[in-house]
């Protein structure tokens, strides 16, 4: 019964992506069923077409790509032909674009020259994030249903040897104001699949993400999307098979709509982590997550906030002591299967010592959170618990609501861990504290 539902849901999303190839200039009309927090600007029509040349012999095609972009910038369409493979071995800064479409019908493949990419990929100034390219400007669309391949296997193996290497992100959407991304197939990213930074009014529609390691070395940190310092973003109608957050709202993400996603193998749809860097102010507000299927994952709804004292999860992930707020966050309608936590809210992220976390509570507040209409079954890994809502102090969490949460463990239990939170606002079975 579950398998039938999963297959029908996934195939439905893929069908949505396929029909999106009839590209719509009206981004607002393309959004549904929910509409974005603010109207998305309409894309202008294009009046010329440029086809990208390819060497066809494994040689770097970056010069051909830049030539076509310059030729068709300001009102044109650049086509990556269906029967061609395009090799990118050069870091491309494409933030100069305006009123242009990139129609990807063929395959774009990044080289596996790890020394070059570590030295030349674009450093984004957040959590060691680097990108193969930077796509930005104004009214830029990238669609067509073709494939973008990050050649990730060499990076998965290298990261197993040295977890401080700089692994490029497949899609760097940097400084884009007005754009549509998708439909596209994204494969084998070395790290995140999307890093959306300093951008606004962007629609992601019909993205098919997949790429697992073919060796014993896992593909790690392969988030589907990370938004950062970005506003009015829509992510919808997509299928994500990965090994980390399906979507993650990083610092200063505002007015974000996520809807109609099928996530498999992920760490959930996450706010944060936030408060990682001392003396920095992180804000995430006005986020609506709707109609999600989450399978074989660690979490569904997740809010991750660092405590007020420094702590460390690993050599490349440590911090705590930052301030800010999480406000007006809604998770509405989710089907889960084999997920460890249906809901996980913590202000002790990275700190295993709960006593120390409570002694130095987070300076980042969580308020006005609504989680509703969840159904399904957990993995049972946390039996008898199916969720956890743990704040570091009652003064730093307020107005957290849950309703219609019909989630059980395989054994039929539905217990929650609740700490420093107003249980009268929760419709769940709080039976334990984090102590």
From Swiss-Prot:
Basic and acidic residues biased stretches: 45-55
Cited Pfam families: Glyco_hydro_28
SUPFAM superfamilies: Pectin lyase-like
Keyword Signal included in the entry's annotation: yes
EC number: 3.2.1.67
Active site: 244 (proton donor), 267
Cystine crosslinks: 246-263, 391-397
GO cellular component: extracellular region
Single GO MF annotation: polygalacturonase activity
Region entry Disordered, spans: 32-55
PbH1 repeats: 199-229, 230-251, 253-273, 326-347, 361-409
Alphabetical UniProt keywords: Cell wall biogenesis/degradation, Disulfide bond, Glycoprotein, Glycosidase, Hydrolase, Repeat, Secreted, Signal
Family: Belongs to the glycosyl hydrolase 28 family.
Protein name: Exopolygalacturonase X
Organism: Aspergillus tubingensis
């Amino acid at each position: 019964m579950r398998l039938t539902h999963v297959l029908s849901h996934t195939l439905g999303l893929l069908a949505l992506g396929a029909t999106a190839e009839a590209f719509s200039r009206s981004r607002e009309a393309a959004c549904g069923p929910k509409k974005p927090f603010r109207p998305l600007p309409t894309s202008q029509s294009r009046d010329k077409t440029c086809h990208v040349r390819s060497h066809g012999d494994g040689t770097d095609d970056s010069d051909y790509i830049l030539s076509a972009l310059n030729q068709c910038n300001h009102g044109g369409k650049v086509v990556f032909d269906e029967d061609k493979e395009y090799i990118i071995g050069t870091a491309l800064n494409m933030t100069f674009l305006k009123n242009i479409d990139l129609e990807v019908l063929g395959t774009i493949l990044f080289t596996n020259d790890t020394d070059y990419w570590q030295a030349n990929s674009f450093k984004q100034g957040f959590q060691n994030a680097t990108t193969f390219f930077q796509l930005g400007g104004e009214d830029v669309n990238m669609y067509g249903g073709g494939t973008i391949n990050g050649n990730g296997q060499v990076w998965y193996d290298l990261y197993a040897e040295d977890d401080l290497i700089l692994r490029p992100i497949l899609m760097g959407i940097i400084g884009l104001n007005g754009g549509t991304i998708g439909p596209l197939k994204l494969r084998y990213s070395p790290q995140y699949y999307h890093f959306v930074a300093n951008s606004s009014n962007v629609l992601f529609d019909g993205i098919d993400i997949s790429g697992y390691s073919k060796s014993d070395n896992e593909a790690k940190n392969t988030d589907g999307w990370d938004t950062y310092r970005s506003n009015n973003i829509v992510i919808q109608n997509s299928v994500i098979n990965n090994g980390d957050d399906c979507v993650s709202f990083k610092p200063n993400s505002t007015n974000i709509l996520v809807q109609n996603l099928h996530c498999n193998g992920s760490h959930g749809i996450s706010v944060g982590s936030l408060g990682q860097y001392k003396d920095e102010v992180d804000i995430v507000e006005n986020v609506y997550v709707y109609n999600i299927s989450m399978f074989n994952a660690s979490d569904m709804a997740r809010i991750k906030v660092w405590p007020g004292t420094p702590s460390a999860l690993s050599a490349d992930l440590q911090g705590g002591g930052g301030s800010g707020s999480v406000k007006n966050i809604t998770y509405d309608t989710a089907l889960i299967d084999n997920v460890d936590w249906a809901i996980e809210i913590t202000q002790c992220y990275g700190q295993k010592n709960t006593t120390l976390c409570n002694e130095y509570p987070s300076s980042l507040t969580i308020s006005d959170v609504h989680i509703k209409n969840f159904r399904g079954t957990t993995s049972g890994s946390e039996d008898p618990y199916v969720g956890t809502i743990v704040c570091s102090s009652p003064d730093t969490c307020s107005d957290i609501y849950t309703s219609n949460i019909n989630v059980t463990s395989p054994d039929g239990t539905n217990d929650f861990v609740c700490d420093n939170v107003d249980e009268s606002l929760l419709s769940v079975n709080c039976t334990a504290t984090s102590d």
